[in-house]
C-alpha cells in the first residue's frame, strides 16, 4: 500500500462519494441475537373451521393438539479490518489522516456497501428459507419503458393477493432500470413523493418507497439469472447486526501511532412465515430453486 509523503500538496482531502445505507430502513430488526449465534423462530399453526354440531361430545369438531413450525437461523458473517497510521508518516503529511475520520471513511465506503450488497442478495435469493419455501417471483424478461410500469404494479398486486400488508413496502430497483420507469409513456408523476430525497429514496410508487441501487451492489440469482427489481416488506426478514466494534488504539505495543480496528458480525434471513413479503422480477427463467431453499 503506497504512502505518499507531502511536499507542497494541499491539506484538503479529496473525498469519494458515499450513499449511506440503502437497506437499513427496510431491514428487519425484531429479533435479538445478543449472547447467541443461533436463534429459532416459531410459527404457530391454525386449524380449519367446521360446521358446529348441536349434539354429541364433539360439537366443535375433533380436538387436535395445536402444532407449530420452527426455523433455525445461524449467523455466518464475521468481518474485520485494521490499518495503522504511523506517527512519523502523519507528521510529514500535515496530519491529514485523522484516525477517527479514517475509521468513519472505512465504514462508509467499504463496510456499508458490502452489507447492503449482502442483504439484497440474501433477500432476493430467499436465504434461510426451509425446504419448500420460496419468495414470490415472476419472469418479465427484459424491462422496457413500455412494460416496466405494468411489471411493478403486477408485483405489488401479487403481494397484496398474498395478504402482505401495504405499509412498509420498499421497491429496490437499479438506477438505470429506474430511468426506464421515468421515461415510460404513462409515468405516475403525481404519485411521486415531493419530499427531499434522502438515502436513495425517490418517492413512492403504489405506496412503496423507491430505493434506487447502484449496479455495483445489485444482486443476481444464486443459480444464475438477472433480477429486474425487488419489492420487500420490512417484516419479511431477520437482519441482525450482532456486533459492531470500531476502535482506535493509541500507540499500542510495537507501533508509534494509531491502529484502527473494526469487527462486525451480521447476517440476513428470510422468514418462512413471511416469504411472500418479497417479490422479485427476473430477467431469465434460469435459477429456479435459487429464490428459495
Q: Which positions does each model-derived feature cover?
A:
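Sequence/fold signature of self-assembling virion shell proteins
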Residues: 2-25, 30-52, 71-76, 94, ...
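Structured, hydrophobic secondary-structure cores that serve as assembly/anchoring elements
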Residues: 46, 71-97, 152-183
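Short Gly/aromatic-enriched secondary-structure transition segments
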Residues: 54-61
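A glycine-rich, hydrophobic loop/mini-helix early in the fold
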Residues: 66-87, 110-114, 122-127
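Alpha-helical scaffold segments that mediate packing/assembly in large oligomeric complexes
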Residues: 90-161, 279-293
Amino acid at each position: 500500500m503506497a504512502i505518499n509523503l507531502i511536499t507542497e500538496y494541499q491539506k484538503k482531502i479529496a473525498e469519494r462519494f458515499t450513499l449511506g445505507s440503502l437497506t437499513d430502513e427496510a431491514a428487519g430488526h425484531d429479533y435479538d441475537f445478543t449472547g447467541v449465534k443461533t436463534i429459532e423462530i416459531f410459527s404457530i399453526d391454525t386449524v380449519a373451521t367446521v360446521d358446529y354440531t348441536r349434539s354429541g361430545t364433539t360439537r366443535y369438531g375433533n380436538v387436535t393438539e395445536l402444532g407449530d413450525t420452527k426455523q433455525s437461523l445461524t449467523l455466518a458473517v464475521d468481518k474485520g479490518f485494521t490499518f495503522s497510521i504511523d506517527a512519523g508518516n502523519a507528521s510529514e503529511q500535515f496530519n491529514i489522516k485523522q484516525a477517527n475520520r479514517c475509521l468513519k471513511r472505512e465504514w462508509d465506503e467499504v463496510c456499508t456497501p458490502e452489507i447492503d450488497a449482502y442483504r439484497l442478495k440474501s433477500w432476493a435469493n430467499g436465504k434461510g428459507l426451509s425446504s419448500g419455501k420460496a419468495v414470490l417471483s415472476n419472469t418479465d424478461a427484459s424491462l422496457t419503458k413500455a412494460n416496466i410500469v405494468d411489471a411493478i404494479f403486477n408485483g405489488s398486486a401479487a403481494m397484496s393477493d398474498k395478504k402482505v400488508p401495504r405499509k412498509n413496502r420498499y421497491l429496490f430497483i437499479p438506477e438505470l432500470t429506474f430511468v426506464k420507469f421515468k421515461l415510460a409513456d404513462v409515468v405516475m408523476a403525481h404519485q411521486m413523493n415531493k419530499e427531499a430525497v434522502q438515502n436513495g429514496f425517490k418517492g413512492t410508487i403504489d405506496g412503496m418507497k423507491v430505493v434506487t441501487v447502484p449496479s455495483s451492489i445489485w444482486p443476481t440469482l444464486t443459480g444464475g439469472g438477472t433480477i429486474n427489481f425487488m419489492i420487500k416488506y420490512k417484516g419479511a426478514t431477520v437482519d441482525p447486526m450482532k456486533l459492531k466494534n470500531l476502535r482506535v488504539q493509541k500507540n499500542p505495543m510495537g507501533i508509534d501511532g494509531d491502529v484502527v480496528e473494526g469487527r462486525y458480525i451480521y447476517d440476513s434471513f428470510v422468514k418462512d412465515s413471511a416469504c411472500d413479503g418479497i417479490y422479485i422480477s427476473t430477467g431469465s427463467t434460469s435459477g429456479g430453486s435459487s429464490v428459495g431453499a
